[in-house]
Each structure stands twice: as structure tokens, then as C-alpha cells.
A protein has these predicted regions:
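Beta-propeller domain segments
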Residues: 1-160, 168, 178
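Short, flexible active-site loop motifs that bind/organize anionic cofactors or intermediates
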Residues: 163
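Blade-level signature of beta-propeller repeat domains, shared across WD40, Kelch, NHL, RCC1
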Residues: 174-181
């Protein structure tokens, strides 16, 4: 298809899983859940910020993507249910994310898969960086997560890497020719 997938909100980057070449997208959610999703040709990512669906009423400018506002101290789980990143109620066949940020966005950036024996148990796992927005007690920057994505691409476990350095953002993660990140 000319359009590989649709229904995305804010993709930050696409990377390909070594060995399978399965594409994965890292995507920012609207004041809540960030996601990593395996892409499927013709797949719908399930983002639909229209008013008057899924229990929502009218929204400013007919766009519900920022409602309810995170600054309003709305519980992240309540906010996520109101405007889900992947709306499986409206789109039951939407591509399911392998990993989400548990309803509290921290500004996910693009990721890459780590390759090479120097990565030991992390070889073949995806690493993602965060901007860190510092709301509701979240840290500002200085965070990398390593995701062990299941072979079917439908689930993942996370290891958060703490770095001994001042807060920093990681908008682009790339392995160099020698395998260093």
C-alpha cells in the first residue's frame, strides 16, 4: 500500500527489528500514554481526537487531543480513558502497542535496536530516550528505557537505565560503526 499505516498521533521515529526487519514506531501520546508499536501494512494506530465519540462531548476547536489537560491534575488513568492514544473501543482492530508509558507521558523520543555482543543481554532489545517533562513528579530528561519486546510484537518488559550525569534529553539514539550508542 502507498500509505503503510494510518491513525497516528505524533510518531517520533521508526526503527526496524534486526533479524525480522519488523518496523516499530515510537509515538508521543496527548498528555498521557506514549507508545511503541509494531507496524502492520494497512494497520490503524487508533488515534481519533474527534469530539462526541467514546463518551466525549464537545472540545475546543473540535479537537479533543489535549482534553482533559494534564496541568489540571487529572489522574493519568482517568485522562487516558477519556482520550485514549490507541482507541480500541472505536477501532477494535487497531494495532496494539507492545509497550506504553503507563498513562503518564514523559515525551518519548525515537528508539533503536541494540545489536552486537557488547550489549550482552540487551543485544536485540530496543532502547528509547525521553525528554522528561517534569509533571506530576516525573523526572526532567536523563532517562533511557530498554525494552525486551516479545517475538509477536504485542508486549514488552522494560528496564529503566539510570545515568550518573546531569539531566539530559535523548532525541536521537544511533549506534555508531563500532556498535557504541
Amino acid at each position: 500500500p502507498r500509505i503503510y499505516t494510518y491513525g497516528h498521533r505524533n510518531p517520533q521515529g521508526i526503527t526496524f527489528r534486526p533479524g525480522t526487519n519488523q518496523p516499530y514506531v515510537a509515538e508521543n501520546g496527548p498528555w498521557h500514554t506514549d507508545e511503541v508499536t509494531a507496524l502492520v501494512a494497512g494497520g490503524n494506530s487508533g488515534w481519533d481526537p474527534r469530539p462526541n465519540i467514546g463518551g466525549r462531548g464537545a472540545c475546543p476547536d473540535n479537537y479533543c487531543g489535549y482534553s482533559p489537560n494534564q496541568m489540571g491534575a487529572v489522574d493519568p488513568k482517568v485522562r487516558s480513558a477519556f482520550m485514549p492514544m490507541t482507541d480500541t473501543k472505536t477501532y477494535p482492530n487497531a494495532m496494539k502497542p507492545a509497550w506504553t508509558n503507563d498513562g503518564l507521558s514523559q515525551g518519548l523520543f525515537a528508539g533503536t535496536f541494540l545489536t552486537g555482543p557488547q550489549w550482552k543481554t540487551w543485544n536485540g532489545r530496543m532502547i528509547i530516550g525521553f525528554a522528561g517533562i517534569g509533571i506530576h513528579g516525573t523526572p526532567v530528561g536523563n532517562r533511557l528505557d530498554v525494552l525486551d519486546i516479545a517475538a509477536d510484537g504485542l508486549s514488552a518488559t522494560r528496564t529503566t537505565v539510570s545515568l550518573p550525569m546531569p539531566a539530559a534529553r535523548f532525541p536521537s539514539l544511533v549506534q555508531g560503526p563500532e556498535g557504541n550508542l
